[in-house]
């Protein structure tokens, strides 16, 4: 899988950008919000998702881990493909999307072309309670985003995982550790709290 591309934007289109990462040029499909943040001839680091099918190969790009995670959750919902997921990310900002999911706002979600009430219901079932607030994404918890995702992948609720990580990060034992030891301690203690 292509996880990330470092390169220079040499072309911007309506729903994609072209990045040169010598010796290759990649066309990367992006949300309208992502596209608006990027500038022509700017050096960028884009997180990616590679979509492979028999008849096509598409590369989707994201500015941050959370946007990619939401995209991956969306495409795991029956009836939503990568292009529909990207339309959803283009249709509303992260906080708007999160709030619509938490409120089960069918009207807001179904404003996206191709998303009806039935598919909106599936999205709510899949994503409700899994998305964190945008201000939490920029907190010190974000430093341990990979650890958080690993624990969520073990079947734990994201909100409970984030809450446990925040609590553990405040205790003296954690604060006295060197940075390289903090992640192991955090992983072990978070699992203890969530399992106990």
From Swiss-Prot:
Pfam families: HHH_5, RuvA_N. Residues 139-196 are annotated as: Domain III. This is Holliday junction branch migration complex subunit RuvA. Keywords: Cytoplasm, DNA damage, DNA recombination, DNA repair, DNA-binding. Belongs to the RuvA family. It is found in: Cytoplasm. Disulfide bonds: none annotated. One of its GO terms (molecular function) is ATP binding. The RuvA-RuvB-RuvC complex processes Holliday junction (HJ) DNA during genetic recombination and DNA repair, while the RuvA-RuvB complex plays an important role in the rescue of blocked DNA replication forks via replication fork reversal (RFR). RuvA specifically binds to HJ cruciform DNA, conferring on it an open structure. The RuvB hexamer acts as an ATP-dependent pump, pulling dsDNA into and through the RuvAB complex. HJ branch migration allows RuvC to scan DNA until it finds its consensus sequence, where it cleaves and resolves the cruciform DNA. The gene is ruvA. Residues 138 are annotated as: Flexible linker. One of its GO terms (cellular component) is Holliday junction resolvase complex. One of its GO terms (biological process) is DNA repair. It comes from Borrelia hermsii (strain HS1 / DAH). Homotetramer. Forms an RuvA(8)-RuvB(12)-Holliday junction (HJ) complex. HJ DNA is sandwiched between 2 RuvA tetramers; dsDNA enters through RuvA and exits via RuvB. An RuvB hexamer assembles on each DNA strand where it exits the tetramer. Each RuvB hexamer is contacted by two RuvA subunits (via domain III) on 2 adjacent RuvB subunits; this complex drives branch migration. In the full resolvosome a probable DNA-RuvA(4)-RuvB(12)-RuvC(2) complex forms which resolves the HJ.
């Amino acid at each position: 899988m292509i996880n990330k591309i470092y390169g220079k934007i040499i072309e911007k289109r309506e729903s994609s950008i072209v990045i040169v990462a010598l010796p290759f040029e990649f066309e990367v499909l992006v949300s309208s919000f992502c596209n608006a943040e990027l500038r022509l001839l700017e050096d960028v680091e884009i997180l990616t998702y590679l979509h492979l099918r028999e008849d096509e190969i598409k590369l989707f790009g994201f500015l941050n881990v959370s946007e990619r995670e939401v995209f991956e959750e969306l495409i795991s919902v029956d009836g939503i493909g990568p292009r529909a997921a990207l339309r959803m990310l283009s249709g509303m900002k992260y906080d708007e999307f999160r709030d619509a999911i938490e409120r089960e706002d069918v009207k807001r979600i179904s404003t996206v072309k191709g998303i009806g009430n039935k598919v909106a219901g599936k999205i709510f079932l899949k994503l409700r309670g899994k998305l964190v607030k945008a201000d939490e994404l920029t907190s010190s918890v974000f430093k341990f985003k990979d650890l958080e995702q690993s624990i969520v992948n073990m079947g734990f609720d994201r909100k409970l995982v984030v809450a446990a990580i925040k609590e553990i990060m405040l205790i003296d034992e954690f604060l006295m550790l060197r940075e390289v030891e903090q992640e192991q301690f955090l992983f072990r203690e978070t699992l203890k709290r969530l399992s106990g």
